[in-house]
Amino acid sequence: MLKRASFVEVNTHSLRHNFNAVKNIVPKDACVMAVVKANAYGAGAIKASEIFLQEGANYLGVATLDEALELRSHFSQTPILILGYSPNTNASMLIDNDLSAMVFSLEQAEVFSQMALKSQKRLKVHLKIDTGMHRLGLEPTFKSIETIKKIRALKGLEVEGIFTHLSNADSNIKTHAKNQMKVFNAFLEQLLDQKIEFQYRHAYNSAGILSLCNGNENRLLNLYRPGIMLYGFYPSNEMKESSQTILKNVISLKARIVQIKRVKKGEFIGYGEHFYTNEETLVGVLALGYADGLVRALGNRIQVAINNQLAPLIGKVCMDQCFVKLNDIEAKEGDEVILFGDKSTKANDASEIATLLNTIPYETISTLSKRLERVYV
């Protein structure tokens, strides 16, 4: 029984299909880290992780300690890597919950080592290398090799992996991505020359998986990190047009009509004066708003699907509610409205919503609030 008249519908068959699409692309003996940060990009981290693990995921990737702890409470043995920054104050929680952390400096590693020794436990870490995104990471230099030697010598740490992140493998021109991999591979080879090896070596996100697995740039990799493609979206429109891989929509934002009102001509609907009734208007009120992840700016800009018909979203989206115009639409209170989802329903998909808002589908789906229940079908 749903507690609200709005929800996120998650297609579990599509989750399985998309994960297996990854498995069909990466090398047969490769490991896969399913990235389930931001509540699995809106799909619900626990259920999505359960499905990915059933389908053969070897590792789960998140961005924050809280996300990792939520997963650990359900998956006691599964390897979980926090891909984002972990403050030194989180060290004891990382150790006590057998979580893996990203490390990018000797100072950070020393703190983690000290805490691990106090706990008489070991903390697994993955070293982040900055090959050209210029976010977090050690520079791929001789000096960093010396730093890595010092980190590996610290007691209490298990330096399990090394990785980098590709910044624009989703573009048509792969020069920068290939240059990043050239730098990363050269650095790995320099480390190997000094007998420094890692259980896991990873770099490819969804864009890398979809576009760079046919060359030899990934020859030293053995772990792959799919994110957005698991949830049915290509990293860019360019990739959608060029990819041979079929991905299936996972997430639909839905609500039910909670009241239908007949509003006379000459009235304004909702806050401000953003929709004027130039005729008698049937207005359907939905219990869904921008606090749920339906962007306020979508008012008066999109059509939604009701009983296989298209109806305009009118007025400004409120924090908890919004309006649809039902003139010439067969609808009644309680009927389902699809704000975005599978194209077969006539609704926009999240990619089209993102284009309208001059953003990317990552943002459209990952900002869907946790106060919306997830319904798995």
Swiss-Prot record:
Query: What pathway annotation does it carry?
Result: Amino-acid biosynthesis; D-alanine biosynthesis; D-alanine from L-alanine: step 1/1
Looking up Pfam families in the UniProt record yields:
Ala_racemase_C, Ala_racemase_N
EC number(s) on file? 5.1.1.1
Q: Which residues bind substrate?
A: R135, M319
Give the positions the UniProt entry annotates as the active site: K37 (proton acceptor), Y271 (proton acceptor)
Which EC class does it fall in? isomerase
In Gene Ontology terms, what is a biological process of this protein? Answer: D-alanine biosynthetic process
What the entry lists under InterPro entries is as follows: Ala_racemase, Ala_racemase/Decarboxylase_C, Ala_racemase_C, Ala_racemase_N, Ala_racemase_pyridoxalP-BS, PLP-binding_barrel
Function in brief: Catalyzes the interconversion of L-alanine and D-alanine. May also act on other amino acids.
User: What family does this belong to?
Assistant: Belongs to the alanine racemase family.
- Name the UniProt record assigns to this protein: Alanine racemase
